[in-house]
């Protein structure tokens, strides 16, 4: 991991910090600086976002690691993650748009992992409230209205212990050509019965409470009908995860996450097109199929009606493949937007091979501005030999269709715990005066 000059300049004039915050700044601050540098952010925007990261994100990451085992295993980053409370995303640019950088965190506080806060809500809500007071574009009206509908009504002590865990995450998007920081909140119902009631009870009532009794629920109702009556849509399963934009109510989107265990490309295409109701050109479907097969390590000649080959773990057990999607619900739209997620953490393809496949796709189709800058980021976070031989940096690639091209985002992990010993060697070799 090589330092970026602007990170050094910002660090030089920061006030003293405690040991935990110093650690997280040295690791994740450098990651953020490298991403913005490679993405071509203006220097003033880099400084602004680094200061936001230092003072509004770093204090929420909790104690620094003391070993390669997390004291609290965060759900950020999904199955690929090592328990670290932060991960990143890189939304590849288009011909007229630079890449966009985001991070996702599960805020950790004094009550995290204690009986006083079994769902780890306190630190997250405090952070969101702070954002609403310091970021002019952040509006929590929708979040505060939705959140009580997702909170479980748990009385029995055994149930509380059984269902304890993360219930909220926060995402921050830092666009290169904007002076705002866009905030998203993600809610996770902990009680299984809540998930089954999401489309029929919880979301309709939450949307009426937020937008008024006469809110148009066409988009939400379509998702419910698609998942109950359509032959392909009925194979989808709700995860319960719901994302919400923390902005003015009229601009807020609600994202509903689902999974399927049908891995045939015909099924994937049917979900992306909402059973043909949202057409996608044959050319784009062909691009998506080629990318899907390559990232999943499937032979190019595999018929589109066939399931992906079952993957086997090193211990000989089977590794089930699931495909996540989300539906983007907005009251003013009759149909939801759809995004697919390609999990590469369980793929037989190495992280480096997967990243190269995406960059190659973008270059072949004239998408993105300097997509190889993304490779520079990955190689800076993790040595090339580890990207070639180990898994864990890459979590997902998401794919949506925007303006007649594939809009691709990479989600990846800093591996703070997995690479704990390497980080210790690196940090102990740095000049302490730069950071303290």
Swiss-Prot record:
Signal peptide: none annotated. GO terms for molecular function: prenyltransferase activity. GO terms for biological process: alkaloid metabolic process. Its EC number is 2.5.1.-. It is an enzyme of class 2 (transferase). It comes from the Eukaryota. InterPro entries: Aro_prenylTrfase (IPR033964), Aro_prenylTrfase_DMATS (IPR017795). Pfam families: Trp_DMAT. Pathway: Secondary metabolite biosynthesis. Keywords: Transferase. Prenyltransferase; part of the gene cluster that mediates the biosynthesis of neosartoricin B, a prenylated anthracenone that probably exhibits T-cell antiproliferative activity, suggestive of a physiological role as an immunosuppressive agent. The non-reducing polyketide synthase nscA probably synthesizes and cyclizes the decaketide backbone. The hydrolase nscB then mediates the product release through hydrolysis followed by spontaneous decarboxylation. The prenyltransferase nscD catalyzes the addition of the dimethylallyl group to the aromatic C5. NCBIfam families: arom_pren_DMATS. Belongs to the tryptophan dimethylallyltransferase family. This is Prenyltransferase nscD. It comes from Trichophyton tonsurans (strain CBS 112818) (Scalp ringworm fungus). The gene is nscD.
């Amino acid at each position: 991991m090589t330092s970026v000059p602007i990170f050094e300049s910002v660090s030089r004039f920061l006030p003293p910090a405690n040991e935990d915050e110093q650690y997280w700044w040295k690791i994740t601050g450098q990651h953020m600086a490298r991403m913005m540098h490679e993405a071509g952010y203006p220097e003033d925007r880099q400084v602004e976002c680094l200061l936001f990261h230092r003072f509004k994100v770093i204090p929420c990451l909790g104690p620094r690691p003391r070993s390669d085992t997390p004291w609290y295993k965060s759900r950020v980053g999904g199955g690929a993650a090592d328990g670290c409370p932060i991960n990143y995303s890189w939304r590849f640019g288009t011909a007229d748009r630079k890449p966009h950088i985001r991070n996702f965190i599960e805020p950790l506080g004094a009550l995290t992992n204690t009986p006083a806060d079994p769902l780890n809500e306190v630190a997250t809500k405090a952070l969101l409230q702070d954002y609403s007071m310091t970021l002019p574009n952040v509006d929590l009206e929708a979040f505060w209205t939705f959140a009580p509908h997702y909170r479980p009504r748990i009385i029995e002590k055994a149930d509380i212990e059984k269902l304890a865990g993360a219930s909220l995450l926060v995402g921050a998007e830092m666009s290169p050509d904007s002076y705002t920081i866009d905030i998203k909140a993600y809610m996770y119902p902990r009680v299984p019965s809540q998930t089954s009631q999401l489309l029929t009870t919880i979301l309709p009532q939450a949307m009426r409470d937020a937008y008024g009794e006469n809110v148009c629920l066409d988009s939400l109702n379509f998702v419910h009908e698609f998942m109950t009556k359509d032959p392909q849509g009925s194979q989808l399963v709700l995860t319960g995860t719901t994302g919400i934009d923390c902005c003015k109510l009229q601009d807020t989107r609600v994202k509903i996450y689902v999974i399927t265990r049908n891995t045939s490309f015909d099924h994937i295409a049917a979900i992306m097109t909402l059973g043909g109701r949202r057409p996608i050109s044959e050319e784009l479907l062909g691009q998506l199929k080629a990318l899907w097969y390559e990232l999943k390590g499937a032979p190019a000649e595999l018929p589109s009606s066939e399931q992906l080959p079952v993957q086997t773990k090193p211990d000989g057990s089977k590794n089930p493949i699931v495909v996540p999607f989300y539906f983007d619900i907005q009251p003013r739209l009759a149909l939801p937007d759809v995004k697919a997620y390609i999990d590469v953490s369980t793929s037989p393809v190495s992280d480096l091979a997967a990243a190269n496949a995406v960059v190659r796709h973008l270059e072949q189709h004239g998408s993105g501005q300097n997509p190889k800058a993304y490779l520079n980021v990955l190689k800076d976070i993790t040595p090339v030999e580890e990207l070639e031989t180990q898994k864990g940096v890459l979590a997902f690639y998401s794919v949506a269709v925007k303006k007649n091209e594939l809009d691709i985002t990479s989600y990846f992990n800093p591996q703070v715990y997995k690479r704990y010993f390497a980080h210790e060697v690196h940090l102990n070799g740095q000049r302490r005066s730069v950071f303290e």
